[in-house]
């Protein structure tokens, strides 16, 4: 199951283990149990610190296996086969159960260790989901750190009865003590913030006490990361306030056009961005959403008010708030979000195996989604508002070659239908004849572009009719000292490599602004100061 190269790498990782790892496997006579045992038996051969016990017990999930160590009360289990994107989760779990320290911040680790109460987490994932490992790894670490936290990571494809009973149509989906806890990508910081009700107040007080920055970057995507690095390299006080570090990149499956890196995945790039920024003296403030920008007053400081009630001040600000998936804004979309309405075909596609779905949008993203889904689902209907598809010709040719795809153009989606629990259909208007049409299906994947995260700037910073921040060729906005970069701006072509360049440029422009505004007004002023 593991090739020679992977075994060599894994053997090297397992040398970091400092205490015994006990694997307790719960199996039956299924082919899945045999497949899981093949993997576990290979792991045992890679380290003398790993042992395997096989049980034909009454565990509700078979095949599954738990990881523990003598003398420690750890409850961490994988149900299914953690390969694909989740293989890294398995490796990290082995290391952490085996005593290798986590790289999480010491303050966060202490917060997890002191959580009060009993928490039984269940995370449903799919092997093709790039968002799932973050959640699985966060909760696995929590289970290692705190004996009152238990976690089971469940491959939804292997436990379809549970998925259907709980009507799970989006991953990752997390249950806590039998009740729905949350869905979508979550960091350990975000999870702890939901469990520790006083965390937000403590965080706000800590932020409010910070001194003013020279450069404050709002947003932690490619543009914000580049801006932070370039600003910090100038030796000036730099801060980053971000709702989630990595931004939209975290939701990108495959990246093949970032020059010098032939192929990577969004979460890997996001992790690399944060690692690079942390090499410099940058104050990173995660889980922070900006709600208002107040231009500089008499003190020369721009103020950013945050959703938690705290405020940050800075001599200059770089706005790199990025963009989010654009919604259809039709009846039923919000009601059935994560109940059949989805925005990530890579994550949620496997949950619709054998079902009928629609993809809304005929650009590159929509056509790529339809092609990917066609290999999983029973049938795909692609719905495009325009009278023709806008995707690259090579993608259109591939799409039209698929036998289980129907293309509808000149169609305006008007409603998502459901039975109160899940999606059952879609309504669209034929824009050529005006007829109303219904499609029976179980899933709707929305791929109609991005919407800039700039609502909090309305009335303060000049925005285009599309809501993008208007910038000049130096990244300057119409507010002195406020710069902007990335997908939230009017700069054409929303690409990672372009966003990084724009972020770097904005930082250099901000530094130039600081020099010019702090310089003495006249030569006489310099002489007097001397």
UniProtKB/Swiss-Prot annotation:
GO molecular function, one term: NAD binding
Stored Gene3D superfamilies: 3.40.30.80, FAD/NAD(P)-binding domain
Entries under PROSITE patterns matching the protein: GLUTAREDOXIN_2 (PS51354), PYRIDINE_REDOX_2 (PS00573)
Domain of life according to the entry: Bacteria
InterPro entries: AhpF_NTD_C, AhpF_NTD_N, Alkyl_hydroperoxide_Rdtase_suF, FAD/NAD-bd_sf, FAD/NAD-binding_dom, Ferredoxin-NADP_redctase_2, Pyr_nucl-diS_OxRdtase_2_AS, Thioredoxin-like_fold
Presence of keyword Metal-binding: no
Cofactor binding remark: Binds 1 FAD per subunit.
Cofactor needs: FAD
Keywords: Disulfide bond, FAD, Flavoprotein, NAD, NADP, Oxidoreductase, Redox-active center
This enzyme's EC code(s): 1.8.1.-
Pfam families tied to this protein: Pyr_redox_2 (PF07992), Thioredoxin_3 (PF13192)
Residue sites binding FAD per the record: 214-229, 477-487
SUPFAM superfamilies assigned: FAD/NAD(P)-binding domain, Thioredoxin-like
Cysteines joined through disulfide linkages: 344-347
Binding of NAD(+), residues: 356-370
GO biological process, one term: response to reactive oxygen species
Family per record: Belongs to the class-II pyridine nucleotide-disulfide oxidoreductase family.
Complexes and interactors: Homodimer.
Note: The active site is a redox-active disulfide bond.
Job description of the protein: Serves to protect the cell against DNA damage by alkyl hydroperoxides. It can use either NADH or NADPH as electron donor for direct reduction of redox dyes or of alkyl hydroperoxides when combined with the AhpC protein.
Protein name (Swiss-Prot/TrEMBL): Alkyl hydroperoxide reductase subunit F
